Amino acid sequence: MAPDISKKRLPCKVLVFNLPPTLPEQVFLQSINSFLPHVEWHRFSKGKATVGTRSELLSFAYLKFQSATAVQEFFRVYQGHTFIDKKNNTYRAIVTIAPYQKIPPSKVKADSLEGSLEQDPKFQEFKVQRESYSQTASNDDVIEKLQTSTPLLQYLAEKKNAVVEKGKSKPSKKSVKAKKKLRLAEKPASNNSKAGKSSQESKKSSKAPAESAAAVIKEDKVSDRKKSKKKPKKTPVSNSTASQASENASDKKTKEKKSSGKQKIASKKKDQLTTDNV
C-alpha cells in the first residue's frame, strides 16, 4: 500500500521481499535500474535454496528513497514484479514500508584521539620512568624485590617446613614393614614358650589329683586287708538249736530214700510193660 503524501513525516525506507532464494544482487539492481538515481541507500540479503529437509529462505532488500513521490512511483511500478528461476518457479515481489526507518551512518566519525598516543603527557612520563629504571636497576635488585615475602608467605613457608620435618622424623614405610615382620616372627616363639609352660603346669595340676586318688585307693585296700585278717568271733550254739539241726538232717535223708524207692518201682513197671508188648 502506497504512503499518504498528506502526512507531515513521510516514510522513505521500503522493504522488498518474497524474492527468489537464488536471485543475485546484480539482477535485482538491474530490475530497479530506473529508480536507482532516486535511491540513496540500499541493502540486499540473499536467501538459501532447499537442501535436504531444510526449507528455502527467500531473498529480501531494503531501499531508502530521497523523496516520497519516488516511493509512490516505486510502489505503483514494482508491486507484484515477477521472477522465474531455473526450475520455472514463479515469485512475485511484495513492497511494503519498512518498520524501522533509520539507516546506518554512511560516514564513520573519526576518533579525535587516534594517533595522539605519543603526544600524551602520561605516556611520556611512563616512557621516562621505564628508561631510568632499566638503567639503574640490576637483575639482583629485581630478584630481591620479587622475593620479598609477606606474612602470609612466611606462614606458608613455616607450615611447609614443619611438614617436612615431621616427614623426616617419621620412619619410612620399609622400616615399618621390617619391624612388623620381626614382631610376627617373635610372636610364634613367645607363643611356643607360653604353650610349653602352660602344658607343664597342666601336667603338674593333673598329676596332683591323680596322686591324691592313688593314695586314697591304697589306704582303702590296706583297711580292707586289715579287716579280712581279723577272725570273726564264734557265737556259742545252744543245745536246742543243735538238736533241731540233727532232726532236720534225718528228715531229709528219709525223704530222699522214699523218693529213690518210688523211682525204682516205676522203672520196673515200665520194663514189664515193654516185655509184654513184645
Swiss-Prot record:
Keyword presence, Plastid: no
A Gene Ontology BP annotation from the UniProt entry: nuclear-transcribed mRNA catabolic process, nonsense-mediated decay
Compartments it resides in: Nucleus, Nucleolus
Pfam families: Smg4_UPF3
GO CC list: cytoplasm; nucleolus
Chief site of localization: nucleus
Region (Disordered): 163-278
Basic and acidic residues: compositionally biased ranges: 249-259, 268-278
The entry's keywords: Nonsense-mediated mRNA decay, Nucleus
UniProt feature, compositional bias: Basic residues: 169-182
Residues annotated as transmembrane: none
GO molecular function: mRNA binding
Comp. bias (Low complexity): 207-216
PANTHER family on file: FI21285P1, UPF3 REGULATOR OF NONSENSE TRANSCRIPTS-LIKE PROTEIN
Protein family according to the UniProt entry: Belongs to the RENT3 family.
Function, in words: Involved in nonsense-mediated decay of mRNAs containing premature stop codons.
Name this protein carries in UniProt: Nonsense-mediated mRNA decay protein 3
Species, as recorded: Schizosaccharomyces pombe (strain 972 / ATCC 24843) (Fission yeast)
Taxonomic classification: Eukaryota, Fungi, Dikarya, Ascomycota, Taphrinomycotina
Gene that produces this protein: upf3
